[in-house]
């Protein structure tokens, strides 16, 4: 959902190629465990043989029903996510942060202060949970920040302005 290019058509046209998608990242519902797989028909039949009879819980089924009944919901959320991501990237560029913004729902940011200390302060002082990672290319020790809607990114940015000096 976070990358405009897709390999779905490639998966439909080629054997042994599958594309999987999950809704948990886009909707911030890690426990939902709802997604789908796209691929050539014979391959899908093989996958169906491996599935258990009740592999989706009641919550996930209600969620899927809501998605079917409101098809514009996904596009709306994708656009909100992209707006928030672009807002964060603009802030990072304007404030001379080094970062790696690939096409997922997160990015790596090299803080101006010690990453471990900043993560601890973010949690304790701002109630923001982020992680640190080692050896991310030229960034070295950096933050792994999940991106989201603009309001969430504004909260994160305000915390960065306050704590990362």
Where are the predicted features?
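Hydrophobic side chains in well-ordered alpha-helices
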Residues: 47, 118-121, 156-159
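Conserved PLP phosphate-binding loop immediately N-terminal to the Schiff-base lysine helix
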Residues: 1-8
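PLP-dependent aminotransferase class I/II
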Residues: 16-92, 97-100
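Conserved PLP-binding catalytic core of the aspartate aminotransferase-like
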Residues: 82, 94-126
């Amino acid at each position: 959902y976070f990358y405009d290019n897709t390999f779905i058509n490639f998966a439909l046209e080629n054997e042994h190629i599958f594309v999987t998608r999950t809704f948990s990242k886009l909707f911030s519902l890690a426990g939902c465990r709802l997604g789908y797989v796209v691929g050539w028909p014979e391959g899908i039949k093989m996958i169906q043989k491996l599935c258990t009879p009740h592999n989706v819980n009641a919550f996930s089924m209600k969620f899927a029903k809501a998605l079917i009944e409101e098809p514009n919901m996904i596009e709306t959320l994708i656009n909100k996510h992209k707006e928030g991501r672009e807002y964060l990237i603009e802030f990072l560029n304007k404030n001379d942060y080094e970062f790696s913004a690939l096409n997922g729902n997160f990015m790596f940011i090299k803080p101006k202060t010690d990453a471990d200390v900043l993560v601890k302060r973010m949690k304790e002082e701002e109630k923001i949970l982020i992680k640190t990672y080692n050896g991310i290319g030229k960034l070295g020790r950096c933050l792994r920040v999940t991106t989201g809607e603009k309001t969430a990114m504004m909260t994160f940015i305000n915390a960065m302005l306050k704590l990362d000096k």
